[in-house]
Amino acid sequence: MSYKCSRCKRDVELDEYGGVRCPYCGHRVLLKERSRDIKEVEVE
């Protein structure tokens, strides 16, 4: 799963046992990125 650090804005891939911390700046607030899927909805 891909996350983005809220301080340095870099993309971060988390390991299962690595903990929740940015490896670049050490910040602990990571934002989950939205999926890039496009959804179509029919309207009547």
From Swiss-Prot:
Recorded catalytic activity of this chain's protein: RNA(n) + a ribonucleoside 5'-triphosphate = RNA(n+1) + diphosphate
Ligand binding (Zn(2+)): 8, 22, 25
GO biological process: DNA-templated transcription
InterPro entries in alphabetical order: RNAP_P/RPABC4 (IPR006591), RPABC4/Spt4 (IPR029040), Rpo12 (IPR023464)
Top enzyme category: transferase
Enzyme nomenclature, EC number: 2.7.7.6
Cofactor comment: Binds 1 zinc ion.
Alphabetized UniProt keyword annotations: Cytoplasm, DNA-directed RNA polymerase, Metal-binding, Nucleotidyltransferase, Transcription, Transferase, Zinc
Entry annotated with the keyword Membrane: no
SUPFAM superfamilies tied to this protein: RNA polymerase subunits
Gene Ontology, cellular component aspect: cytoplasm; DNA-directed RNA polymerase complex
Localization, UniProt: Cytoplasm
tRNA processing as UniProt keyword: no
Cofactor(s) recorded in Swiss-Prot or TrEMBL: Zn(2+)
Pfam families tied to this protein: Zn_ribbon_RPAB4
Gene Ontology MF term list: DNA binding; DNA-directed RNA polymerase activity; zinc ion binding
Family: Belongs to the archaeal Rpo12/eukaryotic RPC10 RNA polymerase subunit family.
Subunit details: Part of the RNA polymerase complex.
Its job: DNA-dependent RNA polymerase (RNAP) catalyzes the transcription of DNA into RNA using the four ribonucleoside triphosphates as substrates.
Protein name: DNA-directed RNA polymerase subunit Rpo12
Organism per entry: Natronomonas pharaonis (strain ATCC 35678 / DSM 2160 / CIP 103997 / JCM 8858 / NBRC 14720 / NCIMB 2260 / Gabara) (Halobacterium pharaonis)
Organism placement in taxonomy: Archaea, Methanobacteriati, Methanobacteriota, Stenosarchaea group, Halobacteria
